[in-house]
Amino acid sequence: MASLRRVKVLLVLNLIAVAGFVLFLAKCRPIAVRSGDAFHEIRPRAEVANLSAHSASPIQDAVLKRLSLLEDIVYRQLNGLSKSLGLIEGYGGRGKGGLPATLSPAEEEKAKGPHEKYGYNSYLSEKISLDRSIPDYRPTKCKELKYSKDLPQISIIFIFVNEALSVILRSVHSAVNHTPTHLLKEIILVDDNSDEEELKVPLEEYVHKRYPGLVKVVRNQKREGLIRARIEGWKVATGQVTGFFDAHVEFTAGWAEPVLSRIQENRKRVILPSIDNIKQDNFEVQRYENSAHGYSWELWCMYISPPKDWWDAGDPSLPIRTPAMIGCSFVVNRKFFGEIGLLDPGMDVYGGENIELGIKVWLCGGSMEVLPCSRVAHIERKKKPYNSNIGFYTKRNALRVAEVWMDDYKSHVYIAWNLPLENPGIDIGDVSERRALRKSLKCKNFQWYLDHVYPEMRRYNNTVAYGELRNNKAKDVCLDQGPLENHTAILYPCHGWGPQLARYTKEGFLHLGALGTTTLLPDTRCLVDNSKSRLPQLLDCDKVKSSLYKRWNFIQNGAIMNKGTGRCLEVENRGLAGIDLILRSCTGQRWTIKNSIK
């Protein structure tokens, strides 16, 4: 501490001296100042010293030499902070420029345990500089755009729980290095009750010494989950704009200005930087194509193709309308985020909140878009920190979204999860406050959202019954889509997941398989009797020439009979050879389907 204070005193004294020289020079002769915002770019320290070769006077040369000396002193002091943690700062080394980093065979052996623990190669991460640069994958036009100097300031919020220290600090360094100083209000680190000791005192001491006054650390007293942890970060933010990021990202140069400019134009826009991938094994940065963010009816997020009007415009730098968000990064006006109810605090852990925000923003007067001119690279981990029964939490959260925002289309979420509409067996908590919020904001209905924001989403309003289909002669097995390439339905021990999701429609079609997502991707297939084979086929409904061959008569606890052939779907017991699913003349076998829609 004493040595650090001496450095600070020395720095202040020298800066005063330098300021005197600069004022003296300013009065003696004009000094050309570079325009633009290059001051916030990362530069090798030697670059300042090299400018002395172009000095116009011995006095200016002395000033530049003094600045170079000061920079060396400060750099050595700050770099010592990272060295004490076993980490690296600077501009070279492994993984520079987003290239794949490697380990020796001996190091590879040491890396196995940490890799399994974190879901990425944390041992390798410690060998990569906190300041490394990554590729600039922005469209060419983006690099030519100019932005106002009077943009709003941003508070960058990182959420972490038991993350590798090197990965967190690289996220912080990258944010500082690639966000203009006058636009970066603060960085907020929200620790969702981590167990790792290095994420406590060592982390706090480092960020407060390395970036004094810039970084706040918020500690949750119990594990809240990503959703509520982000809300805690928002509560302490003071910037006009808040950016929420996973704590395993790296920023591309120029990422902030286009985001803040779009929000300055319209405070009700939620902006998503385009996402690139950091490979979890070697930290290579891999470009992802420009995409919108959509979701399935289970409310699992996914990348989808940008809308047709974006493609028709022929300009890859334009914003991309998106129905929802993947969730690893989003930026929003702080007040607007509060006005629309933040994220749903009644949700647990994570999953579904990203879909809820997209739906809510669009229905309640805002918009959401992906910006190709702003890019953030993100590690897709093999292992998640909140991995205890995450499927249950996602299901529960999805039902909250359905009950509050989806009107009659809420049935699609229940169908996708194979749950009854009434008494699904999951306590989703009280949603009255979220419904009251929707009413107070005078939000549109979900039909409008599907028609205008997510028209690509497949709809299944014609469903009358769904779930596992069981035969009274073989109750332990269910109708199953079997291997996709065989195009034949089979019987398989009941498990209730997607391959066994049967859906009977008003038209008499019998679909089998998980619900489809967008019209650009395959839909669930139809059960077909082609009149020739004893085996029931699963085919693309639109490609079946005879409508009758894909229509079935079925009532609960009754036969399933094809309208075109009159044959029934039945099971045949072949003794030790097993049970087959076949088509034949009806013998009175009966089928039951798990759920119905009244």
UniProtKB/Swiss-Prot annotation:
Disulfide-bond pairs as recorded: C142-C373, C364-C443, C478-C494, C526-C541, C568-C586
Pathway membership: Protein modification; protein glycosylation
Co-factor(s): Mn(2+)
Top-level enzyme category: transferase
Superkingdom, natural source: Eukaryota
First and last residue of the signal peptide: none
Compartment(s) where it occurs, according to its Swiss-Prot or TrEMBL record: Golgi apparatus membrane
The keyword Transmembrane appears for this protein: yes
Ligand binding (Mn(2+)): D246, H248, H378
Name used for this protein in its record: Polypeptide N-acetylgalactosaminyltransferase 17
Organism: Homo sapiens (Human)
Gene: GALNT17
